[in-house]
Each structure stands twice: as C-alpha cells, then as structure tokens.
Amino acid sequence: MERIGLMLGYFDPIHLGHLAMVRDAQKVYRLDTVYLYPLPESSEYTPVLSLKKRRKLIGKCVSDSIKLLSSTIPLVTEDSLIEILSLVQERHGDAAVFPIMGMDRLSRITNFAGIYLLPAVKALIVYSRVGYSSEKVVQLAQGRGAHSIFLRKLSTIPSSEQVREQISLFNDVPEWVPSRVMHAIARKGYYLPNYKAMLKPVLSQSRLKHTISVRKTAVDLAYRHDAPMLKTSVAAMLHDCAKCMTHSAMQKIARDKFLTEDGEVLSSPALLHGVVGAYIAKSSYGIRDKDILNAITYHTVGRPNMTDVELCVLLADSIEPLRPKYPGLEEIRILAKCDLKSAALASLRTTKSYILSIGGKYSMKAQDAIDDLLKKLTRIHQEV
C-alpha cells in the first residue's frame, strides 16, 4: 500500500525546518510521497507573500518524493482539513495518508472525529515546537477525538517568523533556508522593504528598469559564487539612488555633509553619484551595513580589496541584460560566471580603453582597483 504524507502550513517562507520534518517523516514512517500544501490567507493569518509567490518558493524544493499540492481551500474549520485530505485520497485511491503538522497546528484543531472517519487517514505525525507542552497538547487533542498520534521531536526548528526577521537584517541564514529559495527571495526582494516603490519618485523609468535588472543579475552572480545574496540585492537596488540628481545637487550634499573633498570625485557625476548614493541609502533608506554602503559607493570604479558584494554589484551594473552592447561585453559575461575578480578586471579595463580612446581622463581610483585585482589574480595564479 502506498504511504502518503500531507504537510499543511503557510510556508511564509518555506525553510529547512519544514524540509527536516518532511525527511524525518519519510524515513521513519516510510512515506513514498509527501505533499506540501500552502494555505491561502485566512482569518487566522495573513501571509506576507501571496499564495502564488509562496507556491513558487515551494517549487524550488520539490522532488520525486516531495510535491506541491495546489488548491485554494483555506484551513478555517475541521471540514476544510477533511476537504484537503480528500484531495489526496482522490489522487491516490487506497493509499494510507498521514497528515504532518507541528504541535501548534495540532492545538488549533477542535474536532478530530471527521478526520479519522476518512478511510485513508491512518495516523497524525506531529512535531514538537518550542513554547508548546507536547504532553498537554496531545492530551487536549485526545480529548477532542484524536488517536493514533505519532509524536516526533527534532533539534530546534526555526519558525517562518524567525526566518523573516533574519531576512530583514539581510542575513541569508543558509542553516535555515535552502540557497535556491534564498536566491529567489533576494532576486525578487521578497520580505525586504519595497525599494522599487521608494525609488519610483526619484528615478526615471529607464533607470528603474536598469536597477531592477542589476538586482537580478547581481543576485544571480552572488548565488553562483556563494556571496551574500540579500546584501547584494539591497545594494543593487540602491546603487543608483542618486543617479538622477543634478550634479550641483550632489555636490551640495557632498560638501554640506562632508562626504568627500576629492576634486576628481566632486567634478565627476559618474563618481559622485556613488558617494552621495551611499549617504542617501543610509539617511533615507536606513541602511547601516558596511558591505552594502561600500558596494553603492564604489560600484562605478571599484576600489582595492573589494568584497564579493561589491564585485557582484559592480559587474552587474556593467553586464545586466538591458545594457547596450559594447566591445568585450559577452566575454565579460562569460568570465563573470567563472570568476568575479577576473570579470571585474576585464570590465574595468574595457571601460579604461573606451575612455582613453575618446580622449577622456581615466580615474586614478579605477586604476587603483585594476592594480589591486591584477596583483591578487597574479598571486592566485602563482600559487596554483
């Protein structure tokens, strides 16, 4: 007889705690397949993300034995749970079905009689949760008609609320969230402030489109090279927050706030918008993280000892898909998939060649970044 598990929850977002419960249940109770059923909004809880977006995140975790069950039945009453269980029963005929839930979910079910009337339901697999007395909740459930409860305990399982709190602090928490899920979160800016709406009044439409494209490209690079994805996402979204200001307005802020006395920077909008942008990111958008602020400051010309976040944003700014084609662009894109430093060096050198070819003056700050990258790459090659 086929053995099927069904885990219901809001999955806002799905995390490794959910998957640990699924894998434990699969192993201990020999489940062939486990369905994950994301609940729609209800009077009980209004999820941060829409049902559609949460389903997409769950889709990053599906496999041959872990599947997404899609429906819009809210878990409002026990009848709703019976209806959801019936969906599984219809799909799998005479299979044995095991609802999987946390102690918190078990405590909220007030009548179990109808659940056990379903011939497919064999037992409840219930996982202990911090803040809930397993003994008391199980006794309460038994008083409401529950029986055949398989009680399991895993090491500390985070809540989705704890995961969202870490995301708000720009922490990828790889010990809590699968990297492919965090990649999707960072790429779309889920659970982060709505920077797109904040930037809309201060950026042109084309600049905003470029910014969103830079975020996607930068986060893709961070994911590929195991760099901090959330920090990269935020830095990419804010990297051009001062770009549409007039040169004189940027100069005034730089002087009034003592951001720089460097004549080269003050005279160049291309250099100045990064410096002023970092100030605005801090003063207007509440950014305090040094990696993010540095990535905004130096995204145009770089600097010695760039972090991976800085490299991802600098590169994404020059290779994102909306960028007009220029000599060497495709080669830099290919390099970026393999090595951030090599790609950044190629990008800065390409810019230098172009500026010199039209008789322009090349920034010594960019040259410092080139020299530093060349030195580091030479050392790496010598060690190899």
Residue ranges and their predicted role:
Residues M1-N194, K282:
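Nucleotidyltransferase catalytic core that binds NTPs
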Residues L16, A20-M21, S213-K216, V276:
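Short amphipathic alpha-helical face segments that pack within enzyme cores
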Residues D172-K196, S353-V384:
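Charged phosphate-binding loop/patch that engages nucleotide di/tri-phosphates or the phosphate backbone
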Residues L199-V202, V219, Y223-L345:
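Divalent metal-dependent catalytic cores for phosphoryl transfer on phosphate-bearing substrates
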Residues Q205-K209:
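A short, charge-rich alpha-helical start-of-domain segment used by transcription regulators
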Residues L345, K352-S353:
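Internal alpha/beta core interface subdomains
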